[in-house]
Amino acid sequence: MKESYSFSRLKMFGSCKYAYWQNYIEDKDKRPEKEGHGTSDFGNFCHDILERYGKGELAEWEMLDYYEAHFSENIKNDFVLQMTENFSRDMRSKYYDDGYEFFKEFEGFPDFSIISTEKRFDVDCGDFRLNGKIDLTARDEAGKLIIVDYKSKSKFKSKAEREDYAKQLYVYAYAAKELYGEYPSRLAFFMFRTNQWVWFDFDETRMQETLDWCASVVKEIEEEKEKFGDKPFEPIEETIYGDFNFYEANFCPFRSSCKYHH
């Protein structure tokens, strides 16, 4: 049976091979307990509300009340972000306020006709498979297929980061051909905390480049397995100008138990 990979799984390997080994290869009974983070809880909670809206379970005017009523029970972890070795910030109030304002002002997607929300896929891609969940599939006013991924990020830090994340949309575009019989005409990230849209016109060449990237990462994973056998992969340390990147380490699911964490 072919191994199936999600975009997040491939991205984790590129971020830290040791974390990847712990999450996907180490014996389950030996893995340390995974840690969450308030920002991830927030993103999942808002995704859930938008999913309920997309399925017709919540109307626009009900979303804010639902957000207020269920926020605490859905946020299991704190929002503290370690910025440097000696400085951290608690972002709970900021995230809560951003979510409140978003759902307060949300007026739906009047320019779209929703086809599906949180559509799962697991499709063949050569020597491996790709899986995932498309947040929103819809048709625009011209009847063209569009794919939307919700992001709780406020913005992309750079054009390079935006283009790197666009690979996720192109994985979804590839799956759309099997799911709907056509490629989308446009792809978008909806940065809901700031109510901003980041659009991409579909480019088949860019999609093929993304599939080639997926294949190269899968190949590297297999090479690491052969190299290390049953031993852990070596970590990749995120750095900024040679210093440990405390910010990125906030989101590692094994940060407290990791022997490499500073």
PLM regions: where:
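A non-catalytic, helix-rich entry segment at domain boundaries
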Residues: 45-117
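Hydrophobic (often cysteine-bearing) scaffold residues that line and stabilize catalytic clefts
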Residues: 38, 42, 46, 91, ...
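Non-catalytic protein-protein interaction segments used by genome-maintenance enzymes to assemble
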Residues: 116-174, 192
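Active-site-adjacent bridging/hinge elements
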Residues: 18-25, 144-149, 222-223
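Active-site-proximal structural scaffolding
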Residues: 3, 129, 162-165, 169, ...
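Metal-dependent nuclease catalytic regions and adjoining charged, substrate-binding loops involved
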Residues: 174-262
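Nuclease catalytic cores
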Residues: 10-58, 118
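Short small-residue beta-strand/loop micro-motif enriched in glycine and branched aliphatics
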Residues: 30-32, 147, 155-158, 197-200
